[in-house]
Design a protein with these regions (language model features):
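Short, flexible beta-strand-to-coil junctions
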Residues: 6-7, 45-49, 100-105, 169-171
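Flexible internal linker/loop segments at domain or repeat junctions
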Residues: 122-153
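Conserved beta-propeller blade signature
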Residues: 1-3, 41-43, 96-98, 166-167
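Asp-box/WD-like beta-propeller blade repeats and closely related beta-sheet repeat scaffolds
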Residues: 4-56, 66-79
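Residue-level detector of Asp-centered blade-edge/turn motifs that repeat once per structural unit
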Residues: 36-38, 92-94, 161-163
Length: 171
């Protein structure tokens, strides 16, 4: 069992009976974790740039208990204001891992080294124009106040993928 402690910036490991096994400091902000296999996990940092981390996704080697890389650079502009958390940002069915996030109309296939667009949700006139993400906001509240002046779909809040189907909800 792997537990991401966001506040302490640690990964805790327990056996399936709840006995503590190990603790590893990761020294950067991460809000989500997806276990790919026994040797690899992906840590998700959203748009939060840390001193030691500037990627949305960090590849973590579970065997060596160390970071082995990262991908999908965080936008400097979005790092100033776009900090939102979902309960989860991942869904797995079989060997397929999907990734999604708020304020995004795309569902991605996630591999241990890449994030590839898989599905696009056409929200039509309710889609957030890209120009909204290019403005300079001081914080998430300023951004959200601007969004609330419109009737936009804010993105996917939960997602489950199955063999021949996807179940999702969005705002």
């Amino acid at each position: 069992m792997h537990i991401l402690d966001t506040r302490k910036k640690q990964i805790l490991q327990y056996d399936m009976k709840g006995k503590f096994q190990n603790k590893k400091d990761i020294n950067f902000w991460a809000i989500g974790m997806q276990l790919f296999n026994d040797s690899t996990s992906i840590l998700y940092s959203g748009n939060q740039i840390s001193q030691n981390q500037s990627y949305k996704f960090t590849i973590y080697n579970n065997i060596k208990q160390s970071v082995s890389g990262g991908f999908y650079p965080i936008s400097q502009k979005k790092s100033n204001y776009l900090h939102v958390h979902n309960n989860t940002n991942f869904s797995k069915y079989g060997n397929e891992f999907l990734f999604y996030e708020l304020y995004n109309d795309t569902i991605y296939t996630l591999t241990s080294t890449n994030c590839i667009p898989r599905y696009y949700l056409n929200f039509g006139a309710s889609r957030i124009p890209n120009s909204y993400f290019e403005k300079d906001y001081k914080n998430i509240m300023e951004f959200q106040n601007e969004m609330s002046k419109n009737v936009f779909s804010y993105g996917i809040s939960s997602l489950l993928n199955f063999h021949n189907n996807i179940l999702l909800s969005y705002f």
